[in-house]
A protein has these predicted regions:
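A mature extracytoplasmic/lumenal domain signature
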Residues: 43, 57, 65-67, 84-86, ...
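Short structured motifs
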Residues: 45-49, 83-86, 96-98
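Generic detection of short hydrophobic beta-strand segments and adjacent strand-loop junctions
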Residues: 37-39, 51, 87-89, 99-101, ...
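Histidine- and aromatic-enriched segments that form or immediately flank copper-ligand environments
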Residues: 66-93, 119-123
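Extracellular/periplasmic metallocenter environments
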Residues: 3-31, 91-133
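Exposed beta-strand and adjacent loop surfaces of beta-rich binding modules
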Residues: 58, 77-79, 108
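N-terminal edge beta-strand
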Residues: 29-59
Length: 133
C-alpha cells in the first residue's frame, strides 16, 4: 500500500513540476500582421541581424524581450532604436512593445539596444536596417 501511495505522490509531483516548467518557459507565437516586423531580443542579442523595409512605407516594429526581470544587466528590458528615424521602443521583461515609423530616406542604418549586454558596441546588440527605395 505504501508503495502505491509513494508512486502516486511521485507522479503528482513530477506532473506539477512539468506544468510549472512549461508555464515558466513557454512563449506563445506572436500573431502576424501586415507591415509588422517581429524582433526578439535576449541577453544573446537580436534574432535578426538585418531588416529590409521600403522607403515611404509605414512599418511597425514589435519588440519582444525574452529575458525575465531577474537579469542583473538591464533587468530583462530590451530596446530597439534607430536614431536617424527617432525610433526608440523598450520592451519590458518577457513582454512586448511596438513602435511605428515611416522611413523617408533610403540607406543602411544601425538599430541597437543600449540598455544591457554591453550596449550598442556589442555586435549582437545591434544590426542593420536597410531602407530600399
Amino acid at each position: 500500500m505504501n508503495r502505491i501511495i509513494f508512486s502516486a505522490i511521485t507522479i503528482v509531483v513530477i506532473g506539477l513540476a512539468g506544468l510549472f516548467l512549461f508555464k515558466a518557459f513557454y512563449r506563445p507565437p506572436l500573431p502576424v500582421a501586415d507591415n509588422v516586423i517581429d524582433v526578439s531580443a535576449d541577453m544573446g542579442g537580436f534574432d535578426k541581424e538585418e531588416i529590409h523595409v521600403n522607403v515611404g512605407e509605414t512599418v511597425t516594429i514589435r519588440l519582444r524581450s525574452l529575458d525575465n526581470s531577474h537579469h542583473t544587466d538591464g533587468g530583462g528590458q530590451h530596446q530597439w532604436a534607430v536614431d536617424e528615424f527617432k525610433v526608440n521602443v523598450v520592451a519590458p521583461p518577457l513582454g512586448t512593445a511596438m513602435a511605428t515609423f515611416t522611413p523617408t530616406t533610403p540607406g543602411t542604418y544601425v538599430f541597437y539596444c543600449d540598455i544591457c549586454c554591453g550596449g550598442r558596441i556589442n555586435p549582437t546588440m545591434n544590426g542593420k536596417l536597410v531602407v530600399e527605395g
